[in-house]
Amino acid sequence: ERELAKMIYDELGVQTKRDLEQYRASDHGDLIGLDGWTIEAKRYAHNAGGNFKPEWWAQVTSAANATATEPVLIFKYDRQPVKCVVFLSSINGEFAGKDNVATISFPTWCMLVREGWADV
């Protein structure tokens, strides 16, 4: 989580930190400080086909629903690039209300965040 917080700061200039409430209550992401997003971070040594586990996505969407924010699952397996999972509607609003997801690179997710700032 600290490594990811540094990556977010380096790319977006936003200071995020671990959400200690995640250990006391359900429906909390791993990092807080990036308005509009619930961030769940996962890192594992071995992958299962290089994809994310459905329970990881369920965890972050539950937390995002509780706070009315966009969920992002950011995961990394050893010797693999960081990947991000978002609702397709985060990329294209025409998919709003659907459960379709997209797996994108970390720089692409940062671009989505920056574009969201431009829309405000």
Stretches found by the model and what they are:
Residues 1-120:
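Catalytic phosphate/metal-binding cores of nucleic-acid and nucleotide-processing enzymes, i.e., regions
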